[in-house]
Amino acid sequence: MIDVPVALLGYGTVGSAVDRLLAENTDDIERATGHRLRVVRALVRDLSKERPEPPADGVLTTDFASIRDDPSIALVAEVMGGIEPTGDYVLELLRAGKPVVSANKQLIAREGAELFHTASEAGVQLRFEASVCAAIPVIKILREALVATTVHRVLGIVNGTTNYILTKMEEGAEYEDALADAQRLGYAE
């Protein structure tokens, strides 16, 4: 078993859900991958903010450098959203040799070229499948499995939150109720 200390950039709806899901599925993840992922630090703007799912003691920090400069942190999941200061944080992490996973559509769309170039230069990975189609491995299939095929276009709603809300509405739920349910489950902010 390989221990993988993980840091989160953000601990709101999505960050706390990531922490909870990693904790709930630790044994399954370890069995499938041989890796034990555990959240050891989470960057937040306000330590005093009430959180519906508080993390373990000592996990929350307002000090970005404590994540960037900690050699024991093997992976960072960016779940803050937005461009600033998120983009700067991700660039610094990549330059520091830390692999980053991001669910941030806006960041990838706007800053992706620079981020991917920086990751390549640093010899680390920037993974972003969590930002596409509720983390269904669409990007992996397009990049790896269909490497000998030219894909000209992909059409559809490839956003898990939207798909969830539309499915609930198709089942008779009102938009506001479907959105509230998605937020409660950690799918939407």
What are these model-derived regions, one by one?
Residues 1-96:
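N-terminal glycine-/serine-/threonine-rich beta1-alpha1-beta2 phosphate-ribose binding loop
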Residues 9, 13, 17, 62, ...:
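Conserved active-site and cofactor/substrate-binding residues in soluble primary-metabolism enzymes
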Residues 99, 125, 188:
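Residue-level detector of anion-binding/catalytic polar loops
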Residues 58-59, 118-121, 144-147, 172:
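Short, hinge-like loop/turn segments at secondary-structure boundaries
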Residues 80, 85-95, 103-144:
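Rossmann-fold NAD(P)-binding glycine/threonine-rich loop
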Residues 60-61, 78, 101-103, 126-130, ...:
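General beta-strand structural signal in soluble alpha/beta enzymes
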Residues 19-20, 52-55, 112-115, 137-144, ...:
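Short acidic, glycine/serine/threonine-rich loops at helix termini
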